[in-house]
Amino acid sequence: MIDLKHGDCLELMKEIPDGSVDMVLTDPPYGTTACKWDSVIPFEPMWEQLKRITKPNGAIVLFGSEPFSSALRISNIKQYKYDWVWEKSRFANQMLAKIQPLKIHELLHVFSSWKVQYNPQGLIEVNKVTKQGKKVTDNNGGGVRKSEYMQTHTNYPRSILRFKSESNTVHSTQKPVPL
């Protein structure tokens, strides 16, 4: 069941029970345009509510773009885990093309109070023994220490995600569903 609500997110989140959400995925305003709706949500009350509603091992994933992204990560550095980079198929800042590079990416920031669940997609099973040599320097001139391990899979996801930008969207910042 989908229950859509319209209103102030900080007020609406107060209706959500403590520790009841597995994952929050949201695209907050970045405060990088002159649009009326593009006002940054105050970080302190936002984090207070997000931490309250999320399960201990739950994930909080927020879209962002600089300089908003840096401020967002710093605002909750203790829970910050890593970023994904969404490489879009269309650039966004054509009006600034003569003074800065065209922006063709957005960031997804992953936060969690504990070890965030990570389920890599698209793995290929290999099950082979891999040897790894490592140069070791010590007081006797160094040497090579070799180790073996069982590599079970390959094709692990990388930090850059490539998904086509949506066209004819309902909202100007709408993201593609497959992303």
Task: Pin down the residues of each PLM region.
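Core catalytic lobe of class I
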Residues: 1-179
